[in-house]
Design a protein with these regions (language model features):
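Long lumenal/extracellular ectodomains of secretory and single-pass membrane proteins
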Residues: 1-304, 314-486
């Protein structure tokens, strides 16, 4: 976009940040300057870096021999990066406009947050301080953004001490002020876990304020440095004295450890919080899932299918609650057993796809259970989700579905029930063979897997139509703020 529509990109930065996150803006600058970053190696995440920071004496001894050469190479790389930034800024008008726009956006947000801090209105403080590059951080060394932001927060005419001094002295002073007077106080009031971790104040961590993703990301570090503290927090959550964040995290992400057979107390509590929240909203209240999986359930997209299957089973009401329909000739209501997520997923993963599954028989099974249990109309299954990472070979489709569906409707009507809708979701591909077409009554087809699809699934109460998916993709209010300039 920068190559073809540079002014449009720069002018819409604030809107793009709302689509994603403010941290995307320094990354855009970095990639334009230096190209894509190398993918991190497995295990090389922020949590591992934090608790390695101090290092051990043995590590320090091992570094003595090559320390001077490594430091020299590092300084050389920083110099090269700085030269790239300055050269591009001076010679490329489009890049200069983008760079200035990023710096000005951060500066304005930080100044606004400082005003909220001074007035005591801390609830209005945003996350600009969290995602603004820190002094001497990787982003700062490779983009020089800290200085650019600092110059805008503390311009020369903002203080007599800056008048008449050399530019490099002015830059040094405002960079330090940015850290001391902006980053530190704002990050402190945000209670960011990284602030406590880097200061070694593990026992002061406000776990109830730690975002759900950070709880997962720093799990090993929390357990290592503050095991009793995090255990006490979990006890308070179980007792109902506080709540564990479960924001912006999807079902299969919460289940990541359990899918590997590992117990994760944080995930257990986040899962309960998610289920409780969705139940209170009445989401997916009378639905049932069929999970037809052929591959390992540990990785997407199969992990998304089994996570949604478990979630649907826990959100339903009796007699559907805690059950899934087997994907075989028997179409049994399989009970998901176990107290922990590991146990539940183990029983659910054991239900493998087999030959003989038939949609007509699935409806017959549901109707028989409803009649035998003398269920009221509002207790009937509203929607059947067929979740699979395979193609739907052998299922009814095309013109045959019309007669099949009419026969099913008559059976249900004879017992006073409406017919459940069917959602076929092949999470394994976007080009699956399909049993029905999107226009057929009582059926929705979803192919492929993405986080946005999972979010839509939860937000739309499992109602999938082509128009709903398209509307979700392009009709958000945030799109109204976009403008094209070139």
């Amino acid at each position: 976009m920068h190559a073809n529509h540079p002014r449009t990109l720069a002018a819409n930065l604030a809107t793009f940040a709302r689509f994603g996150c403010l941290k995307d803006l320094p990354e855009i600058v970095y990639r334009i300057l230096h190209g894509p970053r190398d993918e991190r190696k497995d295990g090389d995440d922020d949590s591992s870096r934090v608790h390695r920071r101090g290092g051990s004496r043995n590590n320090k001894r091992r570094c003595v021999g090559g320390g001077a050469e490594a430091a020299k190479a590092r300084r050389q790389k920083e110099t090269e990066h700085a030269q790239v930034v300055l050269s591009r800024y001076d010679s490329d008008e489009s890049f200069r406009f983008l760079y200035d726009s990023v710096a000005e956006l951060f500066a304005e947000l930080l100044k606004s947050d400082l005003e909220h801090l001074r007035s005591g209105d801390t609830a209005k403080i945003g996350l600009a301080a969290k995602w603004c590059p820190s002094l001497r951080s990787s982003y700062d060394r490779s983009t020089l953004l800290c200085e650019a932001i600092a110059r805008r927060v503390f311009p020369r005419d903002s203080s007599p001490e800056y008048l008449g001094i050399p530019d490099k002295h002015y830059a040094y002073r405002v960079r330090n002020r940015l850290r001391r007077e902006v980053h530190v106080p704002l990050r402190k009031v945000l209670e960011l876990p990284e602030v406590y971790m880097s200061a070694g104040k593990w026992d002061e961590l406000p776990y109830a304020r730690v975002a759900s993703r950070a709880m997962r990301q720093y799990k090993l570090a929390f357990d290592k440095h503050d095991k009793s503290g995090v255990a006490g927090f979990y006890d308070e959550v179980r007792a109902g004295l506080t709540r564990i964040p479960a924001d912006a995290v999807l079902p299969h992400e919460i289940l990541a450890a359990a899918l590997k057979g590992e117990h994760d107390e944080s995930a257990e509590l986040q899962w309960r919080r998610m289920v409780s929240s969705l139940v209170s909203e009445g989401r997916l209240s009378n639905c049932i899932a069929m999970c037809a999986l052929s591959s390992s359930v540990e990785k997407p997209p199969a992990s998304a299918a089994i996570a949604l299957g478990l979630l649907i089973s826990e959100l339903s009401q009796d007699p559907w609650k805690g059950r899934v329909i087997t994907f075989d000739a028997t179409h049994q209501l399989h009970k998901v057993r176990g107290a922990s997520l590991v146990d539940k997923l183990r029983t659910l993963a054991a239900v493998r796809a087999q030959k003989g599954a038939n949609l007509q028989a699935v409806f017959n099974k549901i109707l028989n259970v409803a009649v035998a249990g003398a269920l009221s109309k509002d207790m009937m299954v509203k929607r059947v989700f067929v979740l699979s990472d395979m193609e739907f070979d052998g299922w009814v489709g095309g013109e045959a579905w019309v007669s099949e569906h009419e026969a099913i409707k008559k059976k249900f009507a004879a017992e006073g029930f409406g017919v459940p809708e069917v959602v076929f979701w092949n999470v394994g591909t976007s080009k699956a063979s399909v049993p029905v077409v999107a226009a057929q009554a009582g059926v929705a087809l979803v192919s492929g897997y993405s986080k946005n699809l999972v979010r839509l699934f939860l937000e739309a109460d499992g109602v999938f139509t082509p128009s709903a998916i398209m509307a979700d993709a392009i009709s958000g209010a945030e799109y109204d703020a976009l403008e094209v300039l070139d």
